[in-house]
């Protein structure tokens, strides 16, 4: 009777197979929805992390803007913290310079994370005013030293003696840790004294040079003091070769920098088209004078 009853049920009546099929369909649908929600949450987390913790280029291509155009960046908390730290240290020297020149004005001090890259560059420009090339470089050295704990240079020398490994290691960590300052870069192979090693860093379009537009700021506030700091304080030679035609730069760890008088940058003229304080009539940037 039971078998007969099952056989005579209308075809539209939900049988056991129908229930099984519907149950499986519902489970698959729920699973797909859960996966979609998880993917959306993951994408949202990645977006939040990229916007808050790490900065990135905001250009559609993901690469620095073409020469003549200013690259757009999305700076996160990590980047703004470094901008604030450096800017506040340099503001002390900018205030001293303004006081000596009798042009000091009352300016409200910005809070943490209120600094952006433009304000960081602006402070650098104020430090440069009223100082010679050597004085500008000395300010940067003092700023860098003030950010290190006591005995840090000596510890660095012990951890990173001037070897191929130390040069390659520092090149590798330069790429992620200095993105906020110079923009995207990559480790490249270089040759030092006939030995090939991956201790070079190619900066695609230096953010500092792009925003300052000043040869003097590039050389006096970045290139020379950074070379000097690594070579003389840390004991790890470093040479930086900026390219003022495309705003790229090459950092070579393990290579001793030449004396300033023998460095090609010593005779570099102003970027008259973009520098606000350029002297087009001079054969080289006036800020490069001692």
Task: Give each language-model segment a name.
Residues 2-30, 39-202, 207-217, 258-290:
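N-terminal accessory segment detector
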Residues 177, 201-203, 226, 240, ...:
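Generic structural hydrophobic/aromatic packing signal, biased to beta-strands
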Residues 196, 243-248:
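Short Gly/Ser/Thr- and Asp/Glu-enriched loop/turn motifs at secondary-structure junctions
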Residues 247-257:
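C-terminal edge-of-domain segments
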């Amino acid at each position: 009777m039971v078998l007969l009853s099952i056989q005579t049920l209308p075809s539209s009546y939900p049988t056991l197979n129908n229930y099984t099929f519907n149950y499986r369909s519902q489970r698959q649908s729920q699973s797909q929805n859960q996966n979609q929600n998880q993917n959306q949450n993951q994408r949202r987390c990645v977006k939040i992390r990229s916007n808050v913790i790490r900065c990135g280029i905001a250009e559609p291509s993901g690469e620095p803007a073409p020469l003549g155009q200013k690259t757009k960046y999305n700076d996160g908390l990590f980047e703004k913290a470094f901008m604030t730290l450096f800017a506040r240290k340099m503001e002390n020297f900018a205030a001293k310079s303004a006081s000596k020149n009798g042009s000091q004005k009352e300016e409200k001090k910005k809070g943490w994370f209120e600094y952006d890259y433009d304000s960081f560059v602006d402070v650098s420009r104020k430090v440069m005013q009223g100082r010679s090339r050597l004085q500008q470089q000395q300010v940067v050295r003092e700023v860098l030293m003030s950010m290190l704990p006591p005995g840090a240079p000596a510890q660095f020398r012990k951890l990173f003696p001037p070897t191929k490994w130390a040069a390659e290691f520092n090149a590798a960590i330069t790429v992620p840790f200095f993105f906020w300052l110079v923009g995207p870069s990559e480790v490249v192979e270089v040759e030092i004294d006939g030995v090939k090693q991956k201790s070079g860093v190619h900066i695609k379009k230096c953010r500092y040079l792009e925003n300052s537009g000043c040869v003097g700021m590039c050389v006096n506030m970045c290139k020379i003091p950074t070379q000097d700091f690594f070579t003389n304080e840390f004991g790890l030679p470093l040479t930086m070769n900026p390219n003022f035609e495309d705003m790229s730069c090459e950092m070579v760890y393990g290579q001793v920098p030449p004396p300033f008088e023998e460095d090609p940058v010593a005779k570099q003229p102003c970027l008259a088209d973009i520098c606000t304080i350029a002297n087009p009539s001079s054969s080289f940037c006036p800020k490069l004078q001692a």
